[in-house]
Amino acid sequence: KYRRYRKADGSLMEDVTSIFNPSSKYITVDRTRGRVTIYGYNSATGSYDTPIKSMICSVGNPISYTAAGTYKIGWQLKKKQMRGEDYVCWAPYVSQIYDAVYFHGVASSTPDLNMISAVDFNSLGSPMSHGCVRLTAIDAKWIYDNVSSGTTVRIGDNLDYPLTNPTRYT
């Protein structure tokens, strides 16, 4: 069902962007597993059957959940101020998914992005956001740099997951 790449030792490659990084991509967000998977378009098969990168994420908490559905990436910003009833923060590498829901790096309490919450960072993989899809800054930057406006994003639960779990950053 999926085209996969393996290392010389036979283990599955989790990030194949160095050898296969097509311009046309498709993204899934699995709310249950806290995983983002990016697929590349395979012109030989005419489908998005090549998983090229996997990321750990936090989606909305039970009060401000991330809505399931199919969306298109909108605008993108290097940094955006976020506001809620009880918070103001700045998020790096913001890519709009729908309305005020974005892919973005773990937010900072300061505009220079030098102070991120250890709780937020260490909670990646669990539903903790205010509805956005929260990523490491490295992964949010990858989406910002490699995914164009108009790319399809599917958000759901228990989605097919062809890769092993991504490694947590420490």
How would you name each of these model-derived features?
Residues Y48, Y65-A68, K80-T170:
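Exported/periplasmic cell-wall-interacting domains
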